[in-house]
Amino acid sequence: MEMEDNWWVTKLKALESKPQRLDALTAMNSAIAKEAALPRQIIERLLTTDQLYDCANPAADSHVPKDQAVDVTLELLCHCLDQLAMDTADEQLSSLLRRGLTHSNPALRAQVLASLFKKLLRQLTVGQVLTLPNNELIFLILDELKQPDTQSTSLAINILSIVLPQRISNADVQAKLVQLLKQNEIVRCRAYELAVVLAKKSATLLSDVTFILDAALSELDNDDVLLQASVMELLVPLAEQNHGLSYMERRRVLDIISYRVQRVEEHPLDALLVPSIMKFFGKISVYQPLKIIGGYPHMLACLFMQLQSEDESILPTAMDTLANLATTPQGKILLNMHFSGAMEKSFKKYGSHTKKLSAHIKKRLLNSLDVIYDFKTPPATEIINIGKNWYECFAGGAHANIIMDLINTPFPDLQMAALSFLKTICKYNWGIVALKNTGGAVEFLLSRQKDLHRDIKYMKWQIMEILSASAEFSPTETIRFTAYVNEGPYHVQADLDVATEPQGNA
């Protein structure tokens, strides 16, 4: 054991000499890769040796060729972390991870955070997250949120969402969180994201981070439109739980934000925020359709006005917003109840949009329709009838001519979006009838064109699979459909050369 320990000490000492560095790192990396589990004291020695971390420093000048030693060092430290019995209840853990978590190389910090997160996930899986002995580890991870060059914001927030609830009421932890709110807007937004993740967990945790959420709300008075849009995006998940929605109601968040739309004429700069506000209300309506559709009619009026526009800068967000409003059964019922005429008018406009707008906007339109019509559990009759009415407004009747026109375009992405929507409406009986009523549609689906993209062939095959199980077709047609399905999506028909005698002159 002593000889083995001396070998590692010698190799670590060699790191001080630049000419010997790469050979020493390579030797240690090879040695640790061969061992399933090195003795704990060797792993600890490696993780606490300054010279090893110095080898992981990236070049200050990006034009300088990459030092191979950096990659070998990262690999070696990754092996160390894998072999470390990482006990989050151990007082020593923060000192073992400190150099990695405070290193200037974001890739190294990401490795340490990933290893720690993996360990915490195991604890979560068995239902026993160990109690941290002090604040040190939390402080180190909170500092990652302040790093200007980070690859690991999400990792750090995921870790903190697991361990921070243990010590969120601690005065020193609260002071550390307050420090984040004094940083630049990027760091502040990371703090807001963390607060929302914690607040979603319980009403108690929401209470503990209310001061951060309140700071986020204060940003809505900022002159920076991009910052306001980012904050609105971060706040959306609060509405997923009733306690989060209650907080938003107490702070009148929805009222304040919707008022910005009403006062656009007085404050023209607020017009820049309207797409973000629409997105905000649309996403919240996925969780709280009654609150949004029933409570903010002027927001819906603004949305319907945008959908009648042909301005391609605002249409994508508007179409996504309508999809969010109409994605749930309750959303469909409420829209049909309160805005029946506006919905029919919007779907008719969608039909005309498919003839006028650019290909990528048409694709976005079809994707939004896919979201509205798709379902996981069979819908009630009322939902089926609402969807049928909206579709016929879009298509101009009980047929699929518009969709087939979009399939017959030279844009593969648009073809795929159109086929995907066709497949979705074929989940409804009225959709199958619409397809059946469309001249050439079934023949196109049954054709075996060789030049089609594989994804398109597969989508056609999926649609035929649905049609083969439908009672809308004759037994003869069903046999043809079933044969097509059994042949598979990529079946190639053999070319038959029929020999014929040349016709002689009479």
Curated annotation (Swiss-Prot):
SUPFAM superfamilies named among the record's database cross-references: ARM repeat
Effect upon mutating residue 263 to A: Abolishes interaction with PI31
Effect of residue 172 to A: Does not affect interaction with PI31
GO terms classed as biological process: proteasome assembly
Effect of residue 261 to T: Does not affect interaction with PI31
Domain of life: Eukaryota
Similarity comment text for this entry: Belongs to the proteasome subunit S5B/HSM3 family.
Cited function: Acts as a chaperone during the assembly of the 26S proteasome.
PANTHER family, per database record: 26S PROTEASOME NON-ATPASE REGULATORY SUBUNIT 5, 26S PROTEASOME NON-ATPASE REGULATORY SUBUNIT 5-RELATED
Quaternary structure annotation from Swiss-Prot or TrEMBL: Interacts with PI31; this interaction is increased by PI31 ADP-ribosylation. Interacts with Rpt2.
Protein's UniProt name: 26S proteasome non-ATPase regulatory subunit 5
Organism: Drosophila melanogaster
UniProt lineage: Eukaryota, Metazoa, Ecdysozoa, Arthropoda, Hexapoda
